[in-house]
Structure formats: C-alpha cells, structure tokens
C-alpha cells in the first residue's frame, strides 16, 4: 500500500494538525482508494467560486457606504424642508446660515440611529447648508401675496358693480319707496312735526249683473316699530281685501279698516255667519228630503186640493217658509230664494248680500 502525504483541504481551519488526525485521514483515504482523485478542473472551479464570493463581499462593502450616504442626504433634505416650513409659517426674519443647536443634535441623532457602516465609512462629511432655495422661496412669497391682493381687489370690484345694478321697477315697490322716503324726510326734519299722507282708494264701477264678482284691492297698513335710538321707523305693508258689491250698495272704506284688530274681528264674524248659513241650508235640504220621502208614501191616499194655500208661489213645493222656525233659520225667511230655483249658490249669494248690507 502506497501512502501519500497530502495537504488536507481544510488547511485554513486546521493550521497545525496533530499526528492522530493525520493518521485517521490517511486511513480514510486508503479505504476510499477506489475513488479517483478530484480532477484539476474541479479545483479551479472552486477557486474561481471563492474569488467571485470575495469580490462580491468587497463590492458590498463599497456599496454600503453609498447607501448610507444616500439615507443621510434624504434625512438632511427632510429636516431642511421642515425648517423651511416652520420659518415661513412663523414669518420670522432669522438668518439662514447653518442649523440651530437642536436641529444639529437631532440630525446627528438620526445619523447615529441609522444602520452602522463598516469602520472605513464611519467618518462622514458634514452637510453644507446653502441659501439658494431660501432666495427662491422668498421671491415666490411676494408673488403669491400680490396675486392674492389682485384677486381680492377684483372680487371687491365685482361686488360693488353688483350693488350698483338697478332692481326691476314695480308699482308696489315704487309706492313703498316713496312712502319710506317721506318718513325718512320727516325724521331728518324735526321742526315739521305734522305730515299727512293720503292714500287714494279707487272705487270699482258697479256691474250690471245682480251681484258683481269679488274684487280685491290693496290696503296700506302703516306700522311703527320703536328703535333703540328713540326714533320711530315706519314700514308699509299691503294686505288683500275681498269685497262683494251689489247693484244698490255703494262701497265706502270706513275708518275702522285702518285698525287691524277690528278687521280681524269683522273677518271672524263674517266667517262665522257664512258657516251658520251653510249649516242652515244643509238642515233645510235634509228636512226637505225627509218630507219628500213621507209624501211619496202617502201620495196615493191624499187628494189634491187646489185651494189649499192662496199665498204660496210656484216654489212652495220646495220650500215652506212657515216651517222654517223649526230648524232655527226663521230670521232668513225674507232672503231665501222662492222664485222657481233650487240653486244653492244663488241662495248663499242673496244671504251674504243681506248680511253685508
């Protein structure tokens, strides 16, 4: 058996092998003697692989300081933006040469807290602050202020032009402005205590029919509102009034209409009377239908009597004026229509004219 003394592969790990270890290695190699020795190409490949790995490690060591410098530059840019924003928001005129003590401490703290590079790249250059960005921002700020003032002046001009635009003229508005101008002139001239304003009310012509349709006109109500300065402010208000005119009735505006309470009371009374008239008409129709039912059942047993009542007219079959006291409307006996008609609107119209006149 031929014994060959070879240098073990793990020479880097075992610098000084012992005699027992070398003996054991030779025994193991003799046992595996059937396998051929490793070729030279495999050894070259291993060496080439080790060289590539060492080169990649060296490149990583060179690239890591570059990444670290980039992170430091990003932190520096972020801190610079924060300081610029704080300076512009507070509008302070402090000098722009270098960092303050708190800013430099925070900057060094961030650089220390970042990933530690190898010993060769721990010494880092100090950042240099330039004022070029500050000058550009200082130039842009007055431009923005000038644009804001320009837009504000344009908005004020447009608002003043809108105020000068004339409102559409209406007769009611012209009358209201005229009355208000009279009252303001009276307030400015204290010597003239007595001023009388007359409001003309145009009467509508009488219609040729029995009852004209409802005509509406405007009634000016002058109200005084006390103010804190002691002077009285007057305002004009127009209220619609519905009036029913007859042929024989002439409309005159009483003085009581100037009082709003009296007008409300008259309106309430008129509504109440109208409601009572409608209720009476309903009761009258109800009694008529009941009577008609009774007469139809007994019509075969009752003989006609032409001389029954000489005072009755053609419509006495519909309305018997003698029996109106039973339903409580005896007072409306004279106003009820008894001339060949059963229309309720005519009856209500005649009753309403009787109440108003």
Curated annotation (Swiss-Prot):
The keyword Membrane applies. Residues 88-104, 112-127, 208-223 have a biased composition (Low complexity). This is Protein BIG GRAIN 1-like A. One of its GO terms (cellular component) is plasma membrane. InterPro entries: BG1-like (IPR039621). Residues 129-139 have a biased composition (Polar residues). Residues 75-87 have a biased composition (Basic and acidic residues). Involved in auxin transport. Regulator of the auxin signaling pathway. One of its GO terms (biological process) is auxin-activated signaling pathway. Keywords: Auxin signaling pathway, Cell membrane, Membrane, Transport. Belongs to the BIG GRAIN 1 (BG1) plant protein family. It is found in: Cell membrane. The keyword tRNA-binding does not apply. Residues 1-146, 208-233 are annotated as: Disordered.
């Amino acid at each position: 058996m031929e014994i060959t003394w070879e240098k073990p592969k793990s020479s880097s790990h075992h610098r000084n092998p012992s005699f027992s270890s070398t003996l054991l290695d030779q025994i193991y190699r003799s046992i595996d003697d059937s396998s051929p020795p490793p070729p030279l190409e495999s050894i070259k490949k291993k060496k080439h692989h080790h060289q590539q790995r060492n080169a990649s490690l060296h490149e990583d060591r060179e690239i890591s300081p570059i990444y670290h410098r980039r992170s430091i530059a990003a932190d520096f840019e972020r801190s610079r933006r924060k300081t610029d924003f704080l300076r512009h928001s507070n509008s302070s005129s402090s000098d722009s040469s270098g960092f303050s003590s708190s800013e430099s401490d925070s900057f060094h703290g961030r650089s220390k807290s970042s990933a530690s590079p190898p010993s060769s790249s721990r010494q880092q250059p100090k950042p240099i602050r330039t004022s070029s960005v500050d000058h550009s921002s200082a130039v842009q700020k007055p431009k923005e202020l000038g644009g804001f003032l320009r837009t504000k002046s344009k908005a004020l001009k447009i608002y003043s032009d809108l105020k000068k635009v004339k409102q559409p003229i209406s007769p009611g508005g012209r009358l209201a402005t005229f009355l208000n101008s009279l009252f303001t002139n009276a307030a400015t001239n204290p010597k003239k205590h007595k001023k009388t304003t007359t409001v003309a009310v145009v009467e509508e012509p009488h219609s040729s029919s029995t009852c004209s349709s409802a005509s509406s006109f405007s009634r000016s109500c002058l109200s005084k509102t006390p103010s804190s300065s002691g002077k009285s402010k007057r305002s004009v208000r127009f209220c619609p009034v519905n009036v029913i005119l007859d042929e024989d009735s002439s409309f005159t505006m009483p003085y009581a209409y100037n009082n709003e309470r009296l007008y409300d009371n008259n309106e309430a009374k008129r509504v109440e009377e109208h409601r009572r008239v409608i209720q009476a008409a309903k009761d009258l129709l109800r009694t008529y239908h009941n009577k008609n039912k009774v007469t139809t059942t007994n019509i075969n047993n009752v003989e006609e009597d032409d001389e029954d009542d000489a005072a009755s007219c053609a419509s006495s079959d519909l309305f018997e004026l003698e029996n109106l006291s039973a339903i409580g409307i005896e007072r409306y006996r004279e106003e009820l229509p008894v001339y060949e008609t059963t229309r309720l609107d005519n009856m209500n119209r005649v009753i309403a004219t009787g109440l108003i006149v």
